[in-house]
Amino acid sequence: MAKPAARPRKKVKKTVVDGIAHIHASFNNTIVTITDRQGNALSWATSGGSGFRGSRKSTPFAAQIAAERAGQAALEYGLKNLDVNVKGPGPGRESAVRALNACGYKIASITDVTPIPHNGCRPPKKRRV
């Protein structure tokens, strides 16, 4: 016997007041993820996903647009306060933080969580152009 069609349940949006913005700024791209305090992702955006391709992905403006998109998507959860974790040496570090501030979030702290080796792996060879 066929099961009756299950009614689609309304997805309940949880309200989160405090969150963490993780900004991963590499030399090629910038990834902005906004999570709650437990680390569950609320929204994310990248420079490449925001319409930038090639060398334009690694610009501060592309990072700014990615941070704005992630910030606007996370506003639906009622987010007010953010702690910002910045990782990586990329050019979009500062502009992404400024864009989140412009979205209306109260930024409590900015932390640099870039992993620093204690003389671990050998770095890539220097470029010869």
Swiss-Prot record:
GO molecular function, one term: structural constituent of ribosome
InterPro entries tied to this protein: Ribosomal_uS11, Ribosomal_uS11_bac-type, Ribosomal_uS11_CS, Ribosomal_uS11_sf
Physiological role: Located on the platform of the 30S subunit, it bridges several disparate RNA helices of the 16S rRNA. Forms part of the Shine-Dalgarno cleft in the 70S ribosome.
HAMAP family referenced in this protein's UniProt entry, alphabetically: Ribosomal_uS11 (MF_01310)
Similarity annotation: Belongs to the universal ribosomal protein uS11 family.
Subunit structure comment from the entry: Part of the 30S ribosomal subunit. Interacts with proteins S7 and S18. Binds to IF-3.
Protein name: Small ribosomal subunit protein uS11
Source organism: Stutzerimonas stutzeri (strain A1501) (Pseudomonas stutzeri)
Encoding gene, per UniProt annotation: rpsK
